[in-house]
């Protein structure tokens, strides 16, 4: 009986130590603030990149940013993994005509760009957001809620 309690307690400690460490994200994905992220070095236009993300676990979307800290995390994640300088993000007004929205439906409460084009990308070396023609090809990051 004592051994059972010891083993059960040990398993509980392991479980609790893994929670919040990315254990909720699939292999190859990185965890931040309850979401999972994965950069893809496969240049695609914006619509194809969003479609590709939807085929990933939990129907992910192109990355959305809710804070400067989250944007910094993603830039640090992409810097060593992506060869491309420009990376798609999920913010566009492609389907909404002058009504910018994140492809994952997240609220637009953090912005860092000048509105000129229908799609946005960020530089993989810092968090500067750039207006891009949606038919251009860029690397991209997919994101889903863990």
UniProtKB/Swiss-Prot annotation:
Highest taxon, organism lineage: Eukaryota
Disulphide bonds in the chain: 25-36, 53-142, 119-134
Record's subcellular location: Secreted
Residue ranges occupied by any C-type lectin domain in the UniProt entry: 32-143
Tissue specificity note: Expressed by the venom gland.
GO molecular function: metal ion binding; toxin activity
Gene Ontology cellular-component annotations: extracellular region
One Pfam family recorded for the sequence: Lectin_C
Signal peptide coordinates: 1-23
Family note: Belongs to the snaclec family.
Protein name per Swiss-Prot or TrEMBL: Snaclec rhodocytin subunit beta
């Amino acid at each position: 009986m004592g051994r059972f309690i010891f083993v059960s307690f040990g398993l509980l400690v392991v479980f609790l130590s893994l929670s919040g460490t990315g254990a909720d994200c699939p292999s190859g994905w990185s965890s931040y603030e309850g979401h999972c992220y994965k950069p893809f070095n496969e240049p695609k236009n914006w619509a194809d990149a969003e479609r590709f993300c939807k085929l990933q676990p939990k129907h992910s979307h192109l990355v959305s940013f809710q804070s400067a800290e989250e944007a910094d995390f993603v830039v640090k994640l992409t810097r060593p993994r992506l060869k491309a300088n420009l990376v798609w993000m999920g913010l566009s007004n492609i389907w909404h005509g002058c009504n910018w929205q994140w492809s994952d439906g997240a609220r637009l409460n953090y912005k860092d760009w000048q509105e000129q084009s229908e799609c946005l990308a960020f530089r993989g070396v810092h968090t500067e957001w750039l207006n891009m023609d949606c038919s251009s090809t860029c690397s991209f990051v997919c994101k889903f809620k863990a």
